[in-house]
Amino acid sequence: MIYKVFYQETKERSPRRETTRALYLDIDASSELEGRIAARQLVEENRPEYNIEYIELLSDKLLDYEKETGAFKITEF
């Protein structure tokens, strides 16, 4: 399952929509909830400075759209 993680690069400032970033993770999980938990743990372990805002499971259509925009790249820690 591919998850899109929205985050701020620092926990020091208040979150602002304009500075929200995203990364993509390929998580092997049996349910969407398990995948969200695993994605959060993975990011928090490897990038503790990130302020995670939201984690979204990408549907096939959304994944195709993300690939078309050119912003899609799986992050590996």
UniProtKB/Swiss-Prot annotation:
Q: Name one Pfam family in it.
A: RpoY
Q: Which EC number(s) does UniProt give?
A: 2.7.7.6
What does the subunit section of this Swiss-Prot or TrEMBL entry state?
RNAP is composed of a core of 2 alpha, a beta and a beta' subunit. The core is associated with a delta subunit, and at least one of epsilon or omega. When a sigma factor is associated with the core the holoenzyme is formed, which can initiate transcription.
Give GO MF terms, alphabetically.
DNA binding; DNA-directed RNA polymerase activity
Presence of the UniProt keyword Zinc-finger in the record: no
Q: Which GO BP terms, alphabetically?
A: DNA-templated transcription
Origin organism of this chain? Streptococcus pneumoniae (strain P1031)
> What name does the UniProt record give this protein?
DNA-directed RNA polymerase subunit epsilon
Q: Which NCBIfam families match?
A: PRK13667.1
User: Catalyses which reaction?
Assistant: RNA(n) + a ribonucleoside 5'-triphosphate = RNA(n+1) + diphosphate
Is NADP there in the keyword field? no
Q: Coiled-coil intervals in this record?
A: none
User: What family name appears in the similarity comment?
Assistant: Belongs to the RNA polymerase subunit epsilon family.
Any idea what job this protein has?
A non-essential component of RNA polymerase (RNAP).
Q: Which UniProt keywords apply?
A: DNA-directed RNA polymerase, Nucleotidyltransferase, Transcription, Transferase
| EC category name | transferase
What GO terms fall under cellular component here?
DNA-directed RNA polymerase complex
Q: What InterPro entries would the database entry show?
A: RpoY (IPR009907)
